[in-house]
């Protein structure tokens, strides 16, 4: 099992399309003008490209809102990643599925453009 993540800003046109796809799984209180971090687990190691264009199945996915002043750097990303891993280790992802998680939901292809301010993709063996 691998944990993969990507960071993106929703105000860009393409990310709004992504938000439209997943908004049914995101709490209504979240605004599409907020930066978001998308964490997902998949059956095998996969990049953001393969996730979006090969329709890689997602086992679970968390969309976390960030405050606008949030500094998108590796340190803060590492902290968020630890939170997600902690929830995963406690098997809380199914419990949170009705709030801000996608469970077994395949993303359809989405094109990305240069409007994305920050993008980072990683994979970590967690089992």
Swiss-Prot record:
Question: Where does it live in the cell?
Answer: Membrane
Bilayer disposition of the protein: Multi-pass membrane protein
Entry keywords, A to Z: Membrane, Transmembrane, Transmembrane helix
Which GO cellular component terms, listed alphabetically, does the Swiss-Prot or TrEMBL entry include?
membrane
Q: Where are the transmembrane segments?
A: 48-68, 83-103
In its miscellaneous comment, the UniProt entry states: Partially overlaps HOT1.
- The name of this protein is Putative uncharacterized membrane protein YMR172C-A
């Amino acid at each position: 099992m691998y944990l993969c993540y990507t960071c993106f800003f929703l105000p860009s046109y393409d990310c709004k399309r992504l938000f439209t796809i997943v908004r049914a799984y995101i709490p209504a209180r979240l605004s599409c003008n907020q930066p978001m971090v998308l964490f997902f687990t998949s059956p095998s190691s996969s990049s953001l490209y393969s996730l979006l264009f090969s329709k890689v199945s997602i086992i679970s996915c968390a969309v976390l809102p960030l405050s606008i002043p949030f500094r998108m750097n590796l340190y803060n990303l590492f902290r968020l990643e630890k939170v997600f891993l902690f929830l995963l280790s406690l098997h809380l992802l199914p419990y949170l599925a009705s709030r801000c998680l996608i469970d077994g939901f395949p993303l359809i292809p989405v094109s990305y453009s240069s409007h994305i301010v920050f993008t980072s993709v990683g994979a970590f063996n967690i089992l």
